[in-house]
């Protein structure tokens, strides 16, 4: 039996639309991510467990884990009879890389079960392909950090899909999921087809400056440059209370904040534990909309997807 855990991730990080993402892990040790188990069997089967299993498609062939198994078998050119279990701990349409968690855990578990026939680059390419079936287009800003860990910059040149960017140990990521769903495809459809020149220039300056600040170890500058002129001005209308929440967390002391992925999760970066706790408390009382919502104080998950049992 192989059991693989794949962590949640926060894509875009305001400054890097479709090209930046960070894997996250709650500081209290909770597993914020999906788990997939693979066991040898006579025929294929898929069982869904976990807090959000009831939100998955009732038709097994529509389940992305089934599609991962099917695509992996196609890649190897043979049928692989296994019993798979998906422990769906991540809410769907949350902006925390929920589909990426399932895809990464499923493909990594299949690869481990079969003795690692695929290298990490090929595996990551498959992960992007499968996740793209749900989001509507191939982009690696969730699957890359989820699989490899840390903060990842998408390269997609010279057979390099992504590379790690150094993060800051003092940064605490407060993630608040309000409990409502935002479809990635819907959130992409709301964006303009073309952008003004000044917005393109500002976006390039912010992203280049952020990467420079990470490598030159300037956390204050990096946080200041986490601005979004590409998606947030258009997507915030999909997120009730988002603008007020951003203003409130800034007043409490967050050094940056924005939309995690395509939302509705809000991220707030803090550089002190007491500030992070105050921000988390405020968001828990004011940004959450129902019982399914949650707030976690996280750090970067530098390990990425990992085998829990083998």
From Swiss-Prot:
Q: Which GO terms describe its biological process?
A: threonine biosynthetic process
InterPro entries according to UniProt: GHMP_kinase_C_dom, GHMP_kinase_C_sf, GHMP_kinase_N_dom, GHMP_knse_ATP-bd_CS, Homoserine_kinase, Ribosomal_Su5_D2-typ_SF, Ribsml_uS5_D2-typ_fold_subgr
Q: Which SUPFAM superfamilies match?
A: GHMP Kinase, C-terminal domain, Ribosomal protein S5 domain 2-like
Q: Which reaction does it catalyse?
A: L-homoserine + ATP = O-phospho-L-homoserine + ADP + H(+)
Q: Provide the alphabetized UniProt keywords.
A: Amino-acid biosynthesis, ATP-binding, Cytoplasm, Kinase, Nucleotide-binding, Threonine biosynthesis, Transferase
Pfam families referenced in this protein's UniProt entry, alphabetically: GHMP_kinases_C, GHMP_kinases_N
A GO molecular function annotation here is: ATP binding
Localization, per the record, is: Cytoplasm
Q: Which residues bind ATP?
A: 91-101
Gene Ontology annotations for the cellular component aspect, listed alphabetically: cytoplasm
Q: Recorded E.C. number(s)?
A: 2.7.1.39
Part of which pathway? Amino-acid biosynthesis; L-threonine biosynthesis; L-threonine from L-aspartate: step 4/5
Region forming the signal peptide = none
- Family, per the entry? Belongs to the GHMP kinase family. Homoserine kinase subfamily.
Q: What does this protein do?
A: Catalyzes the ATP-dependent phosphorylation of L-homoserine to L-homoserine phosphate.
User: What is the name of the protein in this document?
Assistant: Homoserine kinase
Its lineage reads: Bacteria, Pseudomonadati, Pseudomonadota, Gammaproteobacteria, Enterobacterales
């Amino acid at each position: 039996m192989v059991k693989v855990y794949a962590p949640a991730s926060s894509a875009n990080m305001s400054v890097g639309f479709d090209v930046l993402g960070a894997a996250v892990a709650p500081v209290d040790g909770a597993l914020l991510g999906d788990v997939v188990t693979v066991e040898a069997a006579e025929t294929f089967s898929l069982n869904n467990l976990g807090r959000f299993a009831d939100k998955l498609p009732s038709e097994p062939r529509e389940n992305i884990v089934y599609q991962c198994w099917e695509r992996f078998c196609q890649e190897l050119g043979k049928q692989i009879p296994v019993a798979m279990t998906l422990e769906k701990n991540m809410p769907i349409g949350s902006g925390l890389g929920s589909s990426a968690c399932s895809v990464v855990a499923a493909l990594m578990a299949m690869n481990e079960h079969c003795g690692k026939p695929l290298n990490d680059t090929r595996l990551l390419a498959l992960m992007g392909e499968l996740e793209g079936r749900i989001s509507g287009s191939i982009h690696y800003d969730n699957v890359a950090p989820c699989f490899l860990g840390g903060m990842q910059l998408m390269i997609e040149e010279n057979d390099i899909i992504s590379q790690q960017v150094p993060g800051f140990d003092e940064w605490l990521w407060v993630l608040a999921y309000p409990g409502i769903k935002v479809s990635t495809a819907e959130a992409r459809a709301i964006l303009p087809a073309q952008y003004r020149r000044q917005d393109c220039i500002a976006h390039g300056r912010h992203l280049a400056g952020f990467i420079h600040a990470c490598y030159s170890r300037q956390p204050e500058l990096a946080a200041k440059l986490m601005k979004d002129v590409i998606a947030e001005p258009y997507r915030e209308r999909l997120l009730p209370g988002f603008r007020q929440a951003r203003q409130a967390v800034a007043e409490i002391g967050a050094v940056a904040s924005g939309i995690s992925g395509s939302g509705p999760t809000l991220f707030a970066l803090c550089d002190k534990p007491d500030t992070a706790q105050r921000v988390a408390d405020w968001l828990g009382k004011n940004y959450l909309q129902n019982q399914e919502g949650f707030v976690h104080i996280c750090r970067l998950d530098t390990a990425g997807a990992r085998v829990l049992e083998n």
